[in-house]
Structures are given as structure tokens and as C-alpha cells.
């Protein structure tokens, strides 16, 4: 069973699904859904349409250069069936998928870390600019006045008790 890629959005196309368009020069275009086919007919660039994988890779939102992508290449050479080779291949595919997911998760976390640092710098800058909103000029004076009043009252009480 061969799973094709959509020409426009790079999504998977399973057997019996999607649409195929063959141009006069025998170039084959496969589309996973009518949305992709319509955008192709409108001559839209997949790298500029925000929901496509091409846009995500071009904008640096997804991992693009990695050795794990080499295993996904299309191979058209028929190989003689051997049970051992088949089992090893399936085990290797599982391992490669596991490694790829770890690397993608790490890439996303690194990307998010940069944004957190920028957000922190912006927050500090905003607090410095609007410090008067956070701390009123007479905020500490109220406590000082209260303490003075308490001291004066205690002194008055002490003076009255002394004679």
C-alpha cells in the first residue's frame, strides 16, 4: 500500500482517496481534498498559504533539515522478500519515527523558549515605563504616618500613666 503526498499541502493521500490531475505534459498532481485542488487551480503558492506544510517549513515553524527524513524517500526498486529483512525494516521504521518525534518536540520547545525570553524582556520594559501605575508616589507614606500616630498615642498614654 503506497501512501502518496498531496501536491499542495503535503498531506497523506491513502489509496482510494483524493484526486489526481494529469497535465498535458504528463506531470501528475495529486490532491488530498477539494480545498487543495481549488487553491492549485487559483495558482496559489503553497509556501504563502498559512495552513500548508510548505508554509510551516518555509517560516521555520517545523523541522526541515534532519537525517530522519532520509528514510521517507520513495524507492522504486523491487526487493526480494525475506522475513528477517522485513522484520528489521519494520523495527527500524518504528525507531526512526520515535527519534523523529523526539527531535520535533525538542525543536518546538527551543522555538517556544525564544518567544518566552522576548516576552520577558517586553514585560520588564513595560513595567519600567509604567512603574507609576504599580507604585503610587505616596504609597509608603501612609504606613509611616500610621506608625508615627501609634508612637504618639503610646507616648501620650505613657505620659498619663507616669504621674
Curated annotation (Swiss-Prot):
A cellular-component GO term for this protein: nucleolus
Pfam families attached to this UniProt entry: Ribosomal_L24e
Gene3D superfamilies per record: Ribosomal protein L24e
Subcellular locations according to the entry: Nucleus, Nucleolus
Molecular function, one GO term: structural constituent of ribosome
One example of a Gene Ontology biological process annotation: ribosomal large subunit biogenesis
InterPro entries named among the record's database cross-references: L24e/L24_sf, Ribosomal_eL24, Ribosomal_eL24-rel_arc, Ribosomal_eL24-rel_N, Ribosomal_eL24_CS, TRASH_dom
UniProt keyword annotations, A-Z: Nucleus, Ribosome biogenesis
Principal location listed in the UniProt entry: nucleus
Superkingdom in the source lineage: Eukaryota
Family to which the UniProt record says this protein belongs: Belongs to the eukaryotic ribosomal protein eL24 family.
PANTHER family hit by this protein: 60S RIBOSOMAL PROTEIN L24, RIBOSOME BIOGENESIS PROTEIN RLP24-RELATED
Function: Involved in the biogenesis of the 60S ribosomal subunit. Ensures the docking of GTPBP4/NOG1 to pre-60S particles.
Assembly information from the UniProt record: Associated with nucleolar and cytoplasmic pre-60S particles. At the end of biogenesis it dissociates from cytoplasmic pre-60S particles and is likely to be exchanged for its ribosomal homolog, RPL24.
Protein name per the record: Probable ribosome biogenesis protein RLP24
Organism annotation: Homo sapiens (Human)
Protein encoded by which gene: RSL24D1
Amino acid at each position: 500500500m503506497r501512501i502518496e503526498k498531496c501536491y499542495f499541502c503535503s498531506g497523506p493521500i491513502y489509496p482510494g482517496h483524493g484526486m489526481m490531475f494529469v497535465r498535458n505534459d504528463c506531470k501528475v498532481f495529486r490532491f488530498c481534498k477539494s480545498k487543495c485542488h481549488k487553491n492549485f487551480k487559483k495558482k496559489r503558492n503553497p509556501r504563502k498559504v498559512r495552513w500548508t506544510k510548505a508554509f510551516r517549513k518555509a517560516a521555520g515553524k517545523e523541522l526541515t533539515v534532519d537525517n530522519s527524513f532520509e528514510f521517507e524517500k520513495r524507492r522504486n526498486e523491487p526487493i526480494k522478500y525475506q522475513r528477517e529483512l522485513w522484520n528489521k525494516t519494520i523495527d527500524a521504521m518504528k525507531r526512526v519515527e520515535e527519534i523523529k518525534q523526539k527531535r520535533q518536540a525538542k525543536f518546538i520547545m527551543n522555538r517556544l523558549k525564544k518567544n518566552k525570553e522576548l516576552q520577558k524582556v517586553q514585560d520588564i520594559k513595560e513595567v519600567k515605563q509604567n512603574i507609576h501605575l504599580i507604585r503610587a508616589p505616596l504609597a509608603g507614606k501612609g504606613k509611616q504616618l500610621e506608625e508615627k500616630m501609634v508612637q504618639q498615642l503610646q507616648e501620650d498614654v505613657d505620659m498619663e500613666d507616669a504621674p
